[in-house]
From Swiss-Prot:
It comes from Human immunodeficiency virus type 2 subtype A (isolate CAM2) (HIV-2). This is Protein Nef. GO terms for molecular function: GTP binding. Residues 88-96 are annotated as: Acidic. The keyword Ribonucleoprotein does not apply. It is found in: Host cell membrane. A lipid is attached at residue 2 (N-myristoyl glycine). Gene3D superfamilies: Nef Regulatory Factor. Homodimer. Interacts with host CD247/TCRZ; this interaction induces down-regulation of cell surface TCR/CD3 complexes. The keyword Cell cycle does not apply. Keywords: AIDS, Host cell membrane, Host membrane, Host-virus interaction, Lipoprotein, Membrane, Myristate, Viral immunoevasion, Virulence. Belongs to the lentivirus primate group Nef protein family. Residues 39-50 have a biased composition (Basic and acidic residues).
Length: 260
């Protein structure tokens, strides 16, 4: 990733950080539709490009990395349901995603190992996630942002179930989730009180977590070399784990993780 690429992406990523910081508790609604209207105005003259969206770009090929049971891209129905959930979670008085195009700026593509590593380092360079409290809302904002700005289909961001450190299940994504104790810090951890006008993510994060832990994003460059999620918790990959079905199901049951 050269200097010119960094300059082009610098401002959009700064916008991502601002939106993540503005994300707060509660639901959201009609802003997504407003974004769509804004995007339609901005894409005049480029309809041909948008109508020919493809899944070109780098794809992971099975066998490129050993013991990497990648998830297949989400089925169209699942992707539509996911996007509907995103729309349901955007409130008319919430501007967290204002300025994000409603349609991707570039052709759609699936996440790849190289792309995940590159995006992880770029986000770290711009200070986008380090130490930021995790929440389901911020998770969705990151998904939507990377899909609209980078064309990355939002079916890749998953973490191990915990408790404890949550490792990314997509090999190449270098951001893990680390539990922190917020009993003493409360809202002082992120000091912009105007930005956080409702419940602070430090207080709501644990409600998103099945173990009641408060999590923050933390960069770990070693995740590019070692597939921690698969090494530590192969049962979470189900049939792709290589384990006998009875064994991985028993392990999931013992940890209280639902499976189908």
């Amino acid at each position: 990733m050269g200097a010119s690429g960094s300059k082009k992406r610098s401002r959009p990523l700064q916008g991502l950080q601002e939106r993540l910081l503005r994300a707060r508790a509660g639901t959201c609604g009609e802003c997504y539709n407003a974004l769509e209207g804004e995007s339609l105005r901005s894409q005049e003259g480029s309809d041909r490009e948008q109508n020919s969206l493809s899944c070109e770009g780098q794809r992971y090929q099975q066998g490129d990395f050993m013991n990497t049971p990648w998830r297949a891209p989400a089925a169209e129905g699942k992707k539509n349901a996911y996007r509907q959930q995103n729309m349901d979670d955007i409130d008319s008085d919430d501007d967290d995603l204002v300025g994000v195009p409603a349609t991707p700026r570039v052709p759609l593509r699936t996440m790849t190992y190289k792309l995940a590593v590159d995006m992880s380092h770029f986000i770290k360079e711009k200070g986008g996630l380090e130490g930021l409290f995790y929440s389901e809302r911020r998770h969705r904002i990151l998904d939507i942002y990377l899909e609209k700005e980078e064309g990355i289909i939002a079916d890749w961001q998953n973490y191990t179930s915990g408790p404890g450190v949550r490792y990314p299940m997509f090999f190449g994504w270098l951001w893990k989730l680390v539990p922190v104790d917020t009993s003493q810090e409360g809202e002082d951890t992120e000091t912009d009180t105007e930005t956080h006008c409702l419940l602070h993510p430090a207080q709501t994060s644990r409600h998103d977590d099945m173990h009641g832990e408060t999590l923050v994003w933390k960069f770990d460059s070693m995740l590019a070399l070692k597939y921690e999620a698969f090494t530590r918790y192969p049962e979470e990959f189900g049939h792709k784990s290589g384990l006998p079905e009875d064994e991985w199901k028993a392990k999931l049951k013992a940890r209280g993780i639902p499976f189908s």
